[in-house]
Curated annotation (Swiss-Prot):
Pfam families: AAA_14, DUF4143. This is Uncharacterized protein MJ1637. Gene3D superfamilies: P-loop containing nucleotide triphosphate hydrolases. Disulfide bonds: none annotated. InterPro entries: AAA+_ATPase, AAA_14, DUF4143, P-loop_NTPase. The keyword tRNA-binding does not apply. It comes from the Archaea.
Length: 473
């Protein structure tokens, strides 16, 4: 005989009305009790004293829920190794100080899957054990690696629609690609990116400064920046800056030595290539092996523009397969592309700049290849970090990013939603304004920026030291 129990509206669990199922329910209750008891200890190792800037955003959301009953469904997604589990742990320990501890739940969804437990079953058992009404009472639910739950998007949608639970769920960068449109309208999507130098300084030196990117880059206002620049660089060493360029944008670089960081990055790449990529698009093993070779080619410190034809020939794969592979690596947020400035035809025909979103991937691959990091390498890393900063700014403010494909053309062109253009040139030494002025004339830009060694404004050109630019976002 089969009996149906209503758990949430439109969601049913079928259980057999015999002693065997009763035994399973007892085992589930035992599991939930044991899990809740051991969670504080398990998460304590992730509960770092220093917190990423994203923590403050999540903490504010939790406070609004506790104080004003403003529930939310927040999806944190991003590349492996960026500290999503640490953020959940920090929010878990904070929330337990604000409401009854047993109303803060954390589940690692891969562990539930390993134990063949569905999230809805776990919540039903929790509700029965503690006598808590899921529909009305305040509960904070933290879910790590939500993609391990089958039909996770529908489960979260129904939880959000039918209960009073505040939910934060984490997942890989590919997570957003597979959610239903209904959930997309309900959830707040919060991407977790690699760290900027400003965040790195806060976590390593306890130096906290505000972002001055718009004030400096868009408005040429250097008054506050000059004070910040002088103050910061009186407290740190040149090696601090170079270490950030090499490995500092990844949170685990804060605690591990450099060799261990490179090993962790390589392990992370293996998981992304052979696991995450296959969740987005099915490739055979030979193609996935070629993906690794592709990363090595893209890490060339002297190369930055790539044609699909030359890459496909080198890798001995079809051009279409290569395009699909790069597209998936971009969706996994391992890479991002910068298109040439100009017409749609030019964007398609001309080579793209392909950058690593976490710049330390490049140095980890250099380490594997035995590359000694010299000034040329640091120049390559600097341009990649500048590209990463501009990428972040474009994501937040709706700008777009291009480069000028001709020889001697601008490294970057920042384009506002109103089609105002800023030409940007990057280098470690003193740079002349001649090249920038020519690029400005060609693309009809209103402003130019030279990231080098100087700090001044001459006409419509801003000169900013590269070490100062790193402080802006």
């Amino acid at each position: 005989m089969i009996r149906a129990f209503l758990v949430f509206p439109y969601l049913y669990i079928l259980v057999q009305s015999n002693g065997y199922t009763g035994g399973i329910m007892v085992q589930l209750n035992d599991y939930i009790l044991n899990h809740i008891a051991k969670t504080p200890l398990i998460l304590s190792r992730y509960n770092k004293e220093k917190k990423r800037f994203d923590y403050d955003i999540l903490k504010e959301k939790v406070d609004k829920y506790i104080e004003n009953d403003k529930k939310e469904l927040i999806l944190l997604y991003g590349l492996r190794g960026l500290g999503k589990t640490t953020l959940l742990s920090q929010i878990y320990h904070y929330a337990r100080l604000k409401i009854e501890p047993n109303r803060v739940l954390y589940f690692s969804m891969d562990e539930l899957k390993l134990n063949d437990i569905k999230l809805m079953d776990a919540l039903k058992a929790y509700s029965e054990i503690f006598g808590i009404n899921l529909y009305e009472e305040k509960i904070i639910l933290l879910l790590d690696e939500i993609q391990y739950e089958r039909h996770w998007d529908l489960v979260l949608k129904n939880l959000y629609d039918t209960t009073n639970i505040f939910i934060i769920a984490t997942g890989s960068s590919a997570l957003k690609l597979r959610e239903s449109p209904d959930l997309a309208r309900r959830a707040l999507h919060k991407p977790i990116y690699p760290m900027t130098f400003r965040e790195y300084l806060y976590l390593t030196k306890n130096i906290k400064i505000e972002s001055l990117f718009e004030e400096v880059i868009l408005n040429n206002n250097l008054d506050n920046f000059k004070k910040v620049y002088a103050k910061v660089y009186s407290q740190i060493l040149e090696e601090d800056v170079k270490k950030y360029l090499r490995i500092g944008s990844l949170p685990f670089a804060l605690e591990d030595d450099e060799l261990e960081v490179y090993n962790k990055i390589y392990t992370m790449l293996e998981r992304i290539i052979y696991k995450d990529v296959r969740e987005v698009k099915e490739f055979d093993m030979e193609t996935l092996d070629k993906a690794f070779k592709l990363l090595y080619l893209l890490a060339n410190p002297k190369g930055e523009r790539y044609s699909y034809e030359s890459l496909a020939n080198t890798l001995e794969i079809a051009k279409g397969t290569l395009i699909n592979l790069v597209d998936v690596l971009e969706k996994c947020e391992l890479l991002f592309k910068i298109y040439p400035y100009g017409s749609m035809d030019k964007k398609v025909r001309k080579s793209q700049k392909i950058k690593f979103l976490p710049v330390p991937i490049k140095t980890a691959l250099w380490h594997k290849m035995g590359v000694v990091i010299d000034d040329v390498c640091y120049g390559s890393l600097l341009e990649d970090v500048v590209a990463f900063y501009l990428y972040l700014f474009c994501k937040k403010k709706g700008y777009s990013l291009s480069y000028e494909p001709k020889k001697g053309g601008a490294d970057f062109i920042l384009i506002s939603p109103y089609m105002e253009k800023i030409v940007i040139e990057v280098g470690l030494g003193k740079k002349s304004s001649k090249q920038v002025l020519k690029s400005m004339e060609r693309v009809k830009a209103s402003k130019g920026i030279i990231i080098g060694d100087e700090l001044k404004v001459e006409g419509n050109i801003l000169y900013i030291p590269w070490k100062g630019f790193l402080l802006l976002i």
